[in-house]
Every structure is written in C-alpha cells, then in structure tokens.
C-alpha cells in the first residue's frame, strides 16, 4: 500500500495509442470521485510491461458503507423513473461509449494485457450492444393479467429489487461490468460495483465518460481487495442481490454469504469446456475445415483467460494424426507479443501471479505424463516488453483423468485426447465438475444436435465458438454457476414479481 502518487509512470502514448491517465484514481460514489476513507492506494501494474500504470483506491468497509448510503438515497427515485427514461439513459450511455471506443479499448489492453484487436473489435462493441439491448428489452417487457373469475383479476408487476452488489472479474473487466450493470439499471436497481483489483481501469474511465448521465448514487464503484470489500459487500444486509463472476471456490463463498440474508445470487463460475471434433470435419479441404482449425486454436483467445475457454479438445481417433498436424501448425502461427500492435493475436497474461500459475500447471501435466506438443514456455520479449507476462500457446496430449484436463488453468493451455465413438465423446465431455460451455464440430447436423443436447453445459457452440451475443442466454450447469446472464431473461434476475389480486365483487366469501 502507498499513500503518495507515483513520481513517474508509463506513458502508453509511446506505443502510438494515446491514453492520458491520472496518476491516481479514487472511488466513484454518489456521482462524485471520493478518496478512500483510509487514504490508501495500491499500485496498478500493466501486464504489457510489468510497470506501473496508475494508483487506485484501496478501499475498506467504510467505503462500501458510503456507496450503499448513496445507492439507498436514490433507489426509490430510480425505481419510479419511467422505463422510457431509464431506456433513454442506457441508450445515451451506449452512445458515449461508442464515441470513446478507442479510449476504452486502449485502456482495457493496457490494464488487462489482451490484444487491442480484441478490445476494439469485440470487448467494447459487445459492452455497448448490451446497454442498447437491455434498453430495448425494458421497453418491450410487459406484465401479466390473469382472470381468476368474472369479477376477480390477478395483476402481475415487475418491480426492481433495490440495491444490488456486483463483483466483476479481471478477464473481461468492461464487458462483464456491462453484462451486469445494463440489466440491473434497466430493471430499476441501483448498483454498488466492485471491479477486480487487477483490472479496475476501464470501469473507472467508463464512469468518467458516462457518470453525469445517471442520477448520483445509481451506480457506485468501489475499488480494492475482494477478500476485504468483496466479502463485506456480499454479506451486507443492505443489498437485495449479489452477482459474481469468478472462480468456483470464491463463488461458493459468495453463495454462503448470500444465504445469511436470504438474497438471490447470480454466479458465473469456472469451466473446463470440451471442444469436440468429429472425423467428418476433414471430409473436405474447404472453408468449413479452416473454420474448425480456427475453432481448435480458440483456446488461446484472450490468452486462455476465459471461463468458457475450450481447454479440452476431444479429437476422433481416426483423424487424430492428420488433424493435429494441421491444428498444431495453426496454433504455432498465432502472432503473440505486444498487445498494442494491431496484428497481435495473443497478448500478455493478466499478472505475474497468473503467469506462474499457468507455468506450474504445465509442469504438473508433464509430471502426470502428458506430452507437450507445442509451446510450454514463457515467451521472452525485448525492450520495454521484457518484463511483461507473456507465454507460448501450449498443447498437451494426455488422458481426461489428469489434473490438466480436470482443473481450470485459465491460460492458453489446451489438453487434447481422443475418442472413438459419439458415446465415448459424450462421456468424456461430461466427465467434469463444470458445465459452462462446450463446442461441437461436425458436418452431420443430426450428430451435432444429439451431442449438443447430451452435453451437460449451459451453452453449446455448434460449428462455432466464443460468440457472445446479447440476446443469447449464458450461464452454467453443475459447479459452473447459478442463473443466466445476457438475454432478456436476465431482467427477471434483477426483478421481483408482485401479484395484485383484486376482487371487483361486492359479495363476501361466506366463510365467517
């Protein structure tokens, strides 16, 4: 912890991407920038170079209380704001984000390490689209009327929960914040949001850009360690819901916290997603086969730091040798390096600690008897990038009972094995504690459909992978989570239903 601003900091503009940052960022509470109550800040390093990016508020319980005070002060006013006005504000937020797309994308790259080509073409545009989508959904949402009898009617109303807590992961900081904020705000809730300690920057810049569009207190952002303020927020009796994206282990704790106050939770947790390639993908040397090869290589998307990372590849035995020759060649052609270079396809891991975790898992795989087919080493770059957190995309061959097949690594490490029949592929796919995502690749529509229905996962991509449209439901089976994010059904996760049962009859029941 430090109390003084840094005397010098890295200048992102040196790489040709202008990004003017403040030396220090506070919390956003009640529509204002508020210094942490204890006056402490932590150093936020960029994974691009391993150097200081900025300092960020290191908050405590008093800061969460201030945010909750601000949210409760305005919650009734925001809840009674018309859906037309709430939707209009969400559209304005999306427009402001679009006007500042390059700024947000560049900040996300510096803070997280992912390539600028991803943040500018995927992360930020998707975040923008989610605000527009839920602005549209809330305008289209209707209540319901049930006629009990000719003189009795049940009216059903959607009402906001009140003040909700949201805890954001470090792998998609801005997108995950948008996934949670957009439906919560559309439904009429106020938000206390905690960004990940490793990647707070893009959300803070977002509030600089759009904070004036919202009534003070509707959105509050408090920075700091999850073990301190995340736990305090999740256990607070002053929130009506908690939404969390992160590891299964922490998700279990969040769920226990929520039970203390009997509040609903949305949990999007870990995964070990199978990506299944049937023999017919090689029937033709065509665009579909090329697409399948790209689908295989997508384990390296976002440096493998994705809950739905296709980190297990199941390849039909009859094509294994031929398929893997082409697949390895495709993976080895991935351009990794400086995330701020627009041709870079794979950037830096988010932190030195995460880099070490991934390398440790590669060692575990070797000790278990897995063969390293490519990669497996830290990638050393030159110049100002020499202290960045870079890794070679890695493919291991082994058996599904190995730890590298069963445990979430959260890095660009793919565990590959083979299967003979559809039944064996299905058994291997479901042999995991997780059930967040899966991929199926086949030219046979009937086969792909049967596999998709049989796989125990909340989303099964068929002849595609890593698409996250706003109007497609996302969430996990088994230990991958509870509830769904995205899609209009998400509105109901931030609402409660009131039934107003009205009798228009003058006649008594006649019971007493």
Swiss-Prot record:
Write out the catalytic residues in the record: 268, 307
Instruction: Say yes or no: keyword tRNA processing present.
Output: no
Activity regulation annotation text: Magnesium increases enzyme activity with various substrates.
Name of the top EC class for this enzyme: oxidoreductase
| A single MF term (Gene Ontology) | acetaldehyde dehydrogenase (NADP+) activity
Q: What UniProt keywords apply to this chain's record, in alphabetical order?
A: Magnesium, NADP, Oxidoreductase
Q: List its EC numbers.
A: 1.2.1.4
Does Oxidoreductase show up as a keyword for this record? yes
Please provide the Gene Ontology terms (biological process) for this protein.
DNA damage response; response to ethanol
Which top-level group of life is the source organism from? Bacteria
* Catalysed reactions, as listed in the record: an aldehyde + NADP(+) + H2O = a carboxylate + NADPH + 2 H(+); acetaldehyde + NADP(+) + H2O = acetate + NADPH + 2 H(+); chloroacetaldehyde + NADP(+) + H2O = chloroacetate + NADPH + 2 H(+); propanal + NADP(+) + H2O = propanoate + NADPH + 2 H(+)
Conditions for induction: Is repressed by Fis. Positively regulated by RpoS and Crp. Induced by ethanol. Expression is maximally induced during the transition from exponential phase to stationary phase.
Q: Family assignment?
A: Belongs to the aldehyde dehydrogenase family.
Subunit notes for this chain? Homotetramer.
Q: What does this protein do?
A: Catalyzes the NADP(+)-dependent oxidation of diverse aldehydes to their corresponding carboxylic acids, with a preference for acetaldehyde and chloroacetaldehyde. May play a role in detoxifying aldehydes present during stationary phase. Cannot use NAD(+) instead of NADP(+) as the electron acceptor. To a lesser extent is also able to oxidize propionaldehyde (propanal), benzaldehyde, mafosfamide, and 4-hydroperoxycyclophosphamide. Does not use either glyceraldehyde or glycolaldehyde as substrates.
Q: What is the name of this protein?
A: Aldehyde dehydrogenase B
Tell me the organism. Escherichia coli (strain K12)
Taxonomic classification? Bacteria, Pseudomonadati, Pseudomonadota, Gammaproteobacteria, Enterobacterales
Gene name in the database record: aldB
């Amino acid at each position: 912890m430090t109390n003084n601003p840094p005397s010098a900091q890295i200048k992102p503009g040196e790489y040709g991407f202008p990004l003017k940052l403040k030396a220090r960022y506070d919390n956003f509470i009640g529509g204002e920038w508020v210094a942490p109550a204890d006056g402490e800040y932590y150093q936020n390093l960029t994974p691009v170079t391993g150097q200081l990016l900025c300092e960020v508020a290191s908050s405590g319980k008093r800061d969460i209380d201030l945010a909750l005070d601000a949210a409760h002060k305005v919650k009734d006013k925001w809840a009674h704001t018309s859906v037309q006005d709430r939707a209009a504000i969400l559209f304005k937020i999306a427009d402001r984000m679009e006007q500042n797309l390059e700024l947000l994308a560049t900040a996300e790259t510096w803070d997280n390490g992912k390539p600028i080509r991803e943040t500018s073409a995927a992360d930020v545009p998707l975040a923008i689209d989610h605000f527009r989508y839920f602005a549209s959904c809330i305008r289209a949402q209707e209540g319901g009327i049930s006629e009990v009898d000719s003189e009795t009617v049940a009216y059903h109303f959607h009402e906001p929960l009140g003040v909700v807590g949201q805890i954001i992961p470090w792998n998609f900081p801005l997108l995950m914040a948008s996934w949670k904020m957009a439906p919560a705000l559309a439904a009429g809730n106020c938000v206390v949001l905690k960004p990940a300690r490793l990647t707070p920057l893009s959300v803070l810049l977002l509030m600089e850009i759009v904070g004036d569009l919202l009534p003070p207190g509707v959105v509050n952002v408090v920075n700091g360690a999850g073990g301190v303020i995340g736990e305090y927020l999740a256990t607070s009796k002053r929130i009506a819901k908690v939404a969390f994206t992160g590891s299964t282990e922490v998700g279990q704790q969040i769920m226990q916290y929520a039970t203390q106050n009997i509040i609903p939770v949305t949990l999007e947790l870990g995964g070990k997603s199978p990506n299944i390639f049937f023999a017919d993908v090689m029937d033709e040397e065509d665009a579909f086969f090329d697409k399948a090869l790209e689908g295989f290589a997508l384990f390296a998307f976002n440096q493998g730091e994705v809950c739905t990372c296709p980190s297990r590849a199941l390849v039909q035995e009859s094509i294994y040798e031929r398929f893997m020759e082409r697949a390895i060649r495709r993976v080895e052609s991935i351009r990794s390096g400086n995330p701020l270079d627009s041709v870079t396809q794979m950037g830096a891991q988010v932190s030195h600690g995460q880099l070490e975790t991934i390398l440790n898992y590669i060692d575990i795989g070797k000790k278990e008897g897995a063969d390293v087919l490519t990669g497996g080493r830290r990638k050393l770059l030159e110049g100002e990038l020499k202290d960045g957190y870079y890794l070679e995309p890695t493919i291991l061959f082994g058996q599904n009972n190995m730890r590298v097949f069963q445990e979430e690594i959260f890095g660009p490490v793919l565990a590959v094995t083979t299967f003979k029949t559809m039944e064996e592929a299905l058994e291997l796919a479901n042999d995991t504690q997780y059930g967040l995502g899966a991929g199926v690749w086949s030219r046979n529509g009937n086969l792909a459909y049967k596999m998709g229905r049989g796989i125990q996962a909340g989303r099964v991509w068929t002849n595609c992978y890593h698409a996250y449209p706003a109007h497609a439901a996302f969430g996990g089976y088994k230990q991958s989570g509870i509830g769904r994010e995205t899609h209009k059904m998400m509105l109901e996760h931030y609402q409660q239903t009131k039934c107003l049962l009205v009798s228009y009859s003058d006649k008594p029941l006649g019971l007493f």
